[in-house]
A protein has these predicted regions:
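Extended Gly/Ser/Thr-rich low-complexity repeat segments
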Residues: 196-210, 233-248
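Elongated alpha-helical scaffolds
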Residues: 81, 104-133, 263
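Blade-loop segments of beta-propeller domains
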Residues: 67, 74, 93-116
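N-terminal beta-propeller domains
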Residues: 1-96, 134, 138-187, 228, ...
Length: 308
């Protein structure tokens, strides 16, 4: 009778292995994994534990996505995102807040395209086609949903409009110029040398030679009305102009993260290679300032292909 060779495996840290590794006995993962694992949890120590059962907690309205909210070691919550709706549960599955719909701008089709980042009591949720959403914990039983807004500089204000601290980019062709009818004031006509504007630009900011203006009226693809927040150098045609990197016209970021005490956005719909970061400790202030180490960052990641 043939002897049976038995080998004891005690480490499954590599989890379930790709079938392409079936013959890779030279790979360390081969001896620390399994061909198939069903209804098991991997332990940090390398062992396995049977998956526990589940219990009914709530009925969600159609397709949903669950994301964690960990405020502290002893306070955690569960966000259930569904079509234009947010439900909040505690870690035991009890409902904390239900049917929050205000500013929940995601659709069922977008649920698993959303990205999010948490810092303390705040979660940011992004999608390239939607304004950035901010969820804030007021208490263990109270959460609010609002749209993200860049910080404003109220030391620079004209006609009740403040200077913004958001990032800018010139989407228009490099040869296109804009010509202001005056160097300061409100209700000033701005004329572009080629089709540049759409109605959605109304209410957005521009920079002209580094000076901020805000569009307050749309006339045509080549003409808008502006409020000049910082005095312009001249009324000559100027090629050095830029518009908001992030807007309803150009789309919104697809990626968000906190790193080095900054809030980062990337993958904007119309400029997917753009990566921008807030000032250190000022998560709503993306002003580049004079380029000091603690000020905002606005760069493009270049490569052979354009990726998000």
């Amino acid at each position: 009778m043939a002897n049976v060779l038995r080998t004891v495996y005690t480490n499954f840290a590599s989890g379930e292995l790709n079938p392409l590794l079936n013959a890779r006995t030279d790979a360390s993962a081969y001896f620390n994994g399994a061909k198939k694992l069903r209804n098991w949890y991997l332990l940090d120590e390398g062992g396995l534990m049977r998956r526990p059962g589940t219990s009914y907690k709530a009925t969600l309205p159609g397709s949903s996505r669950i994301i964690p909210f960990i405020f502290s070691n002893d306070e955690m919550a569960i966000f259930a995102l569904s079509n234009n709706r947010l439900d909040v549960f505690d870690s035991a599955g009890a409902s904390v807040q239900s049917n929050i719909t205000s500013n929940c701008n995601w659709t069922t089709a977008q649920l698993f395209e959303l990205n999010y980042a948490q810092f303390g009591d705040t979660v940011f949720i992004v999608h390239r086609n939607n304004p950035i959403v901010k969820i804030v914990r007021a208490s263990a039983s109270s959460f609010s949903v609002s749209l993200f807004a860049f910080e404003e500089d109220d030391t620079v204000t004209v006609g009740g409009i403040n200077k913004t601290t958001q990032p800018f980019f010139k989407y228009a062709d490099s040869a296109i110029t804009v010509t202001p009818a005056a160097t300061s004031g409100t209700g000033i006509t701005l004329t572009a040398s080629a089709d540049t504007f759409v109605s959605g630009h109304n209410g957005t900011y521009l920079t002209i030679a580094g000076k901020q203006v805000k569009i307050t009226g749309f006339t045509s693809a080549t003409q808008v009305t502006i409020t000049i927040l910082e005095t312009l150098a001249s009324t000559s045609a100027e090629a050095d102009f830029a518009e908001q990197l992030i807007s309803s016209v150009r789309g919104f970021p697809q990626a968000v993260s906190f790193h080095d005490n900054r809030l980062w956005f990337a993958g904007a719909r119309d400029k997917p290679s753009a990566v921008v970061a807030s000032q250190i400790g000022g998560y709503f202030n993306f002003d580049l300032g004079t380029g000091l180490a603690n000020e905002g960052i606005n760069v493009s990641i270049t490569g052979d292909t354009v990726n998000e």
